[in-house]
């Protein structure tokens, strides 16, 4: 266990473990920030005393959860661990670049924390819109540090994306076509393509913001012929694909978990699932301005972005109904990963429906920047991405560690978490419809009831997080070893035992294609 093993590792399993530990730690930081938000909003009146500090917390909560929790766990953690095992590759295509992708994240996190510690912090929201993010409204180094943090996280993700694209296309056995790789591998491939195409645009946007702030350029300043709306277009051209980047690996995970615990050899409609993911990836790039319905776009532009956004519901529906068809007629095993997966399907669908509501530009004019939007994206993230992470973790934990989690405790944990997140976010739909705006630390008394309910829900979720830590400790303390694994011929990641040896597939895998 020399320190060099972890600092200089080129092993996909070790780097995957580093990502998972880092993501879990960041997840606790992000959860702490969210509890500060809910504490402030638990009753009318001021707790933190200052709107600036409140908005710094909101901004940090978003960045930590997106760039340091969901992406490192889903793409870096499970992607690194499972993709090489699932395609029979000895490691990633570029093992040292893989190491660099991980080690860019801690410095990036450090810069984000530093941005909160200098001056007044970056209270811009995660969108970092100018002129609020300009050098008048946010004098000092805070926003600059945030921009540098995003640059590092972006470089990390771009390198990781190159690595995953090369690995999934190039490292599988020659006899295997791309259409014979598991759906999780496909989901990571599509995610990587989205990252590769969208992140450079974000980098351009925040670099121009950096020069506007420090070098007197006027890209986003009307005084010099610039336009703040340009920044919004650049940001959301990245920002919308980003939300699909966050959920697509989750889609892949849910496909695996649902098929496994339905006793099926494969998910229903494999090709439909693959094409649906590719369609979602493509459509995700041509709908960005639905985040900007309130900036004064032409009616025909609004009509296009409304329609295009609604089209995304079709491939998404293909996936949801394919999961239901996979369940159909199966021998259902009611184990904890299946509970998380079923919770995912139900709650992600609810979040998708509120998304369809918001895609209507006329309705969005009213609902934009209210808690209805917050409720919508937390249903697809806090109950989509996070439920997928939990499903993956309890399903693959025996593979990663060789130990099994306590089945009763994990089920109780699921129940507590399910109640907590729903109690937190369902009332926010009511607040949004009643007109409560986002990003304010105080509110009129009329909104008190549902805010209090929401804050109680956040405390229940906190209990669930603490329970999860206990469950983790219990598993490592009890050391129940894995006895046998079912369905290994269609779930090849399990073939090497639990946990697999440090090096797998050191010789090229022999693949025999069975012709019908």
UniProtKB/Swiss-Prot annotation:
Reactions it catalyzes: 4 Fe(II)-[cytochrome c] + O2 + 8 H(+)(in) = 4 Fe(III)-[cytochrome c] + 2 H2O + 4 H(+)(out)
GO biological process, one term: response to methylmercury
Binding site for Na(+): 40, 45, 441
Residues that bind heme a3: 376
Residues given in the record as O2 binding sites: 244
TM helices/strands, residue ranges: 12-40, 51-86, 95-117, 141-170, 183-212, 228-261, 270-286, 299-327, 336-357, 371-400, 407-433, 447-478
Cofactor note (record): Binds 2 heme A groups non-covalently per subunit. Binds a copper B center.
Binding residues for Mg(2+): 368-369
Ranges facing Mitochondrial intermembrane side: 41-50, 118-140, 213-227, 287-298, 358-370, 434-446
GO MF term set: cytochrome-c oxidase activity; heme binding; metal ion binding
The keyword Heme is annotated on this UniProt entry: yes
EC number: 7.1.1.9
Binding site for Cu cation: 240, 290-291
Subcellular location: Mitochondrion inner membrane
Record has Flavoprotein as a keyword: no
Subunit structure: Component of the cytochrome c oxidase (complex IV, CIV), a multisubunit enzyme composed of 14 subunits. The complex is composed of a catalytic core of 3 subunits MT-CO1, MT-CO2 and MT-CO3, encoded in the mitochondrial DNA, and 11 supernumerary subunits COX4I, COX5A, COX5B, COX6A, COX6B, COX6C, COX7A, COX7B, COX7C, COX8 and NDUFA4, which are encoded in the nuclear genome.
Record family assignment: Belongs to the heme-copper respiratory oxidase family.
PANTHER family: CYTOCHROME C OXIDASE SUBUNIT 1
Function according to Swiss-Prot or TrEMBL: Component of the cytochrome c oxidase, the last enzyme in the mitochondrial electron transport chain which drives oxidative phosphorylation. The respiratory chain contains 3 multisubunit complexes succinate dehydrogenase (complex II, CII), ubiquinol-cytochrome c oxidoreductase (cytochrome b-c1 complex, complex III, CIII) and cytochrome c oxidase (complex IV, CIV), that cooperate to transfer electrons derived from NADH and succinate to molecular oxygen, creating an electrochemical gradient over the inner membrane that drives transmembrane transport and the ATP synthase.
Protein name: Cytochrome c oxidase subunit 1
Organism: Carassius auratus (Goldfish)
Primary gene name: mt-co1
